[in-house]
């Protein structure tokens, strides 16, 4: 074969290849959708279903929470040993706020920052402050005391928000301090102060000695485990908890340096 013939045949083959269809490895037959798009649609359906379920759950919890009448909290004021937070020394209120809910005056019933901080404290074995706000604890202690379910926690948030809308902070703090268990069948702060120390939390009282800074810190530290912490025989863990509370009270300006040092001296005797 001549060289010119070989060249001519090569050109004819090249021209033929140009007109042939080219298929790549991603070719899909007509009418069959790509697998990626199908997977994406399934994922979106799953996410949408989850969102609908969550929305329905929240809606049901909100409806159930409306059965709890926050007006009933006023009944706490009828207790014989009730003392309003307005009539307590600042360091008494500060002992509980520092330990349980240091952002009490800045939130509206739920504190995401405080809850997150409490979670990390628990993880690092520094369980000093609870994750629930004082308002949430008021709701739990009054309406859901024996309920430990997740649904209770959700309802608690809705009711706590209503409590914050209806009552001022001192009223909420009063409900808390007069409806919490201190051990030995004591459910008010005044009753606990009378029972354990022979003192009163009423700053206007002239018949009894007023509760001290240390005594306030002890009672505030006890409510976390009232049946475990023994005031008459304080464990190392309980003592450390009280010490931490006193330090927090000083940091948050509920007590000054002199009061702090005096309380620490009494604690370490």
From Swiss-Prot:
GO cellular component terms?
outer membrane-bounded periplasmic space; plasma membrane
Which reaction equation describes what this protein catalyses?
[GlcNAc-(1->4)-Mur2Ac(oyl-L-Ala-gamma-D-Glu-L-Lys-D-Ala-D-Ala)](n)-di-trans,octa-cis-undecaprenyl diphosphate + beta-D-GlcNAc-(1->4)-Mur2Ac(oyl-L-Ala-gamma-D-Glu-L-Lys-D-Ala-D-Ala)-di-trans,octa-cis-undecaprenyl diphosphate = [GlcNAc-(1->4)-Mur2Ac(oyl-L-Ala-gamma-D-Glu-L-Lys-D-Ala-D-Ala)](n+1)-di-trans,octa-cis-undecaprenyl diphosphate + di-trans,octa-cis-undecaprenyl diphosphate + H(+)
Q: Which residues form a coiled coil?
A: none
Q: Which residues cross the membrane?
A: 46-66
Q: How does it sit in the membrane?
A: Single-pass membrane protein
- Biological process (GO) annotations? cell wall organization; peptidoglycan biosynthetic process; regulation of cell shape
Q: Give a yes or no for keyword Transferase in this entry.
A: yes
Keywords, A to Z?
Answer: Cell membrane, Cell shape, Cell wall biogenesis/degradation, Glycosyltransferase, Membrane, Peptidoglycan synthesis, Transferase, Transmembrane, Transmembrane helix
Q: What is the documented function of this protein? A: Peptidoglycan polymerase that catalyzes glycan chain elongation using lipid-linked disaccharide-pentapeptide as the substrate.
- Similarity comment: Belongs to the glycosyltransferase 51 family.
Protein name, UniProt field: Monofunctional glycosyltransferase
Organism, as annotated: Staphylococcus aureus (strain Mu50 / ATCC 700699)
């Amino acid at each position: 074969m001549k060289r010119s013939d070989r060249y001519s045949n090569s050109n004819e083959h090249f021209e033929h290849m140009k007109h042939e269809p080219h298929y790549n490895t991603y070719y899909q037959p007509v009418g069959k959708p790509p697998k990626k798009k199908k997977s994406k649609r399934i994922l979106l359906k799953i996410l949408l279903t989850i969102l609908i379920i969550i929305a329905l759950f929240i809606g049901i919890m909100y409806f159930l929470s409306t059965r709890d009448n926050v007006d009933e909290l006023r009944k706490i004021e009828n207790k014989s040993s009730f003392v309003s937070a307005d009539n307590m020394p600042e360091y008494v209120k500060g002992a509980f706020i520092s330990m349980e809910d240091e952002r009490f005056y800045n939130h509206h019933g739920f504190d995401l920052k405080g809850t997150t901080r409490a979670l990390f404290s628990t993880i690092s074995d520094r369980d000093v402050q609870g994750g629930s706000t004082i308002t949430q604890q008021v709701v739990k202690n009054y309406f859901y005391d024996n309920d430990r379910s997740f649904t209770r926690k959700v309802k608690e948030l809705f009711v706590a928000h209503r409590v914050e809308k209806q009552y001022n902070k001192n009223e909420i703090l009063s409900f808390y301090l007069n409806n919490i268990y201190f051990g030995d069948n004591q459910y008010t702060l005044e009753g606990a102060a009378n029972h354990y120390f022979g003192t009163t939390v009423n700053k206007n009282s002239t018949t009894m000695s007023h509760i001290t800074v240390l005594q306030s810190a002890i009672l505030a530290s006890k409510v976390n485990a009232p049946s475990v912490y023994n005031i008459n025989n304080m464990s190392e863990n309980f003592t450390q908890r009280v010490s931490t509370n006193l330090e927090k009270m000083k940091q948050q300006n509920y007590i000054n340096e002199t009061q702090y040092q005096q309380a620490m001296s009494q604690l370490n005797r």
